[in-house]
Structure formats: structure tokens, C-alpha cells
Amino acid sequence: MTTDFDAIVVGAGSVGLACGYALARNGQNVAVLERERRVGAGISSRNSEVIHAGLHYPPGSLKARFCVEGRRLLYAFLDRHHVAYDKCGKLIVATQDSELAALDALAARGEANGVEGVTRLDAAQTLALEPALRTVGALHSAESGVFDAHGYMDALVGEIEAHGGAVVLNSPFLGATPAAEQIEVRIGGDEPSTVTTRRLILAGGLQAQEMAATVHGFPADRIPALHFGKGSYFALTGHAPFQRLVYPPPIPGALGIHYRRDLGGQARFGPDLEYVDALDYQVDPQRMRYFEDYVRRFWPGLPDGALTPDYAGIRPKLH
């Protein structure tokens, strides 16, 4: 039985495009469907654009493996495709003695995960790198950095198309019906259609659960409950005296409000974590005081009134 595609990927964010690229370069006839007018319009455009080294995940877990291997592959991909990045490094900073044990645990976890370039620093060593910090010690991750996420996604689109695949915008996924040797996929948009594929990959981010529910016969008990973890960012007016990413020790469910500077030089702090019931990307100005107090734990020199609401993202949480 012939099919229209070897694989259809739903969702043209960073994950969906990476799936499309991996399939296309292995000779698969691939289409990546995206309901929006541009790629990366969801989670992939509302985050910190940080390349993590692999410190935070349990040894032996898929997250640990994918983060460490993926980080190495990502830097190589960015080099090959001339996508901008800054391997600036990251400091995870303890501001009180009670947080030092968390740094030791992260260092041990990083070693178990095979993370390169991780160094435990005392207060003097930390201040030698970033004198404006308040700290009693830190963990330095030399392999962490920031990158141009949109440039990365554009490069993935180019690779998919160069290998004969297609990225189709304005094409919402309406549902699918598996048959014996193929899957019928219903597509909306200006010209609704039904196509067939051997494989269907749902990379719909915040809509992934809804999409899975429209696949006929897919077990409902295999669709995990979704929780919206909103994170707001505040931009800094003026200059921040840091050359590296600055993070607190992680908190349950998140990495904590951190400092990062994008490739254009804009400094931001965020994200926090607020569970919400609906997709709401407005940044509440009333959260500014909380952000100021949080940031001053590690940067006591933050000027009054220097933070302004910037943007928010929503992370899909399964727990």
C-alpha cells in the first residue's frame, strides 16, 4: 500500500523541526505541519535560549542523556550552520551556607552524567569571576551558553527542505485515524485535506494532549495530565555587571529566577514559576517587587526601578 509520506511531524517548534530533520536526513519523505504562520511560535520563542550542560537531571535518566549528548550535538550544529551563540558559562550561586550542599549535589550529579567543565568554587574564587555577586560559593559550568533559537530553527527548516522534506505553515492538525499499514491525517487551513503516512509524531507542545486525544483509538490513559507552568521575565534597564549566566540553586519544579544576557546585549531576569489554568502571556507588573527581592539575594546592587515587565512563557508540566 502506498502512502503520501513516510512520516508526518505535527508542530514546527524546536523539537518538531529536529525530529523532521533527523527523519529527512535519513531518507524519509517528511512533512512538518504547523498551525501558525511561522515556525517556533509557541514554547520555542518564549524561553531563556540557554544551552544547558546537563547538571540538573538524575543520572541514568533520558533527560540527563539527551541534555549532555544534545548539548554537544547542538554546538556542532550551530557551528556548521553559522548560527550565533555565546558559550559564556554559568555560575550556580549559593548566597547562604545552607545552599552549599545543593551545589555539592549538583557537582556530583554532573560528574555522574559526564558533564565537562564543572568546577566547584569558594566565595573568593566566585568573586574573582563576578565581583558584583553576593555569594558564599558557586558551581561553574563552562559548557553552558546562550544561542539564537530562531536562527537554529531556521537552519533546521533549511536542512529539512534540502533533504526533500517540507515544512507546511497555516496547517492545523485536526486528527488522525490509524489503519492496518498507514495513518490517515486530517489537516485544516485554507485548503483542508486528508493525507496518509506510515508514522505520526506529535510535537505540539502545549497542545500535544489535545492532539493525542484526536487520534482515533489512542488510549486515554496513555495521555498524561498537563499543567501550565507560567514563567515571567523582567528586562533590565541599563547594564548588568555579569559576563556569565547566574543561577540560584534549583527549586522544586524549576531552575529558579536567573540572570542572562541575550546575543543582542539585553539583560533579563526570569522565569519564575506560577501554575495557571489558561494560556495567559501577560506579565503582571505587580510581580516586580518579588523579582527585585529575589535578584537582590545574589545581586544586592540592583538599582531601584531598573526592572520592567518583558515577556512570559508557559512550560508544559506533567507533574
What would you call each of these model-derived segments?
Residues 5-32:
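N-terminal Rossmann-like FAD-binding beta1-loop-alpha1 element of flavoenzymes
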Residues 15, 38, 207:
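Conserved Rossmann-like nucleotide-cofactor binding loop
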Residues 24-46:
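Glycine-rich FAD pyrophosphate-binding loop
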Residues 49-125, 256-257:
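Dinucleotide-binding Rossmann-like beta1-alpha1 core, especially the glycine-rich loop
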Residues 58-69, 93-102, 140-159, 168, ...:
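Short beta-strand to alpha-helix junction loop
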Residues 139-199:
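Helical element adjacent to the flavin cofactor pocket in flavoenzyme catalytic cores
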